A protein has these predicted regions:
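Flexible "arm" and connector segments at domain edges
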Residues: 1-102
Length: 102
């Protein structure tokens, strides 16, 4: 499961819990937001260091992309095109190498 899927599930679960209650949902402060993102990135880097797998690398890349889109610094179409332009051949080359090496 990719980060995007997990985040979407957690947000929907939180929305469902507060839908019928009188609760106000507030954004975290900038410091708390960045602390959470940094913690998640460190966690994913630890996994990548242990597994050295493309799936772990994809999780980190998707997390960065999701943050950029969520903050409005880029749009999803730009992210998709950027990945296709810069990583398509690279990704395919190393994916095939990893599978063949097993």
């Amino acid at each position: 499961m990719l980060v995007r899927d997990k985040v979407g599930e957690e947000i929907q679960r939180a929305i469902d819990k507060v839908a019928d209650s009188d609760v106000e949902v507030q954004m975290l402060t900038n410091e708390e937001f960045f602390d959470a993102i940094i913690l998640k990135i460190r966690s994913e880097l630890d996994v990548l260091e242990q597994t050295k797998s493309l799936d772990s690398l994809a999780e980190i890349m998707e997390l960065v992309d999701w943050v950029q889109v969520a903050l409005g610094t880029t749009n999803i179409q730009d992210v998709i095109q950027n990945r296709a332009d810069k990583l398509g051949l690279y990704w395919k080359k190393y994916y095939i190498k990893e599978k063949a090496g097993k």
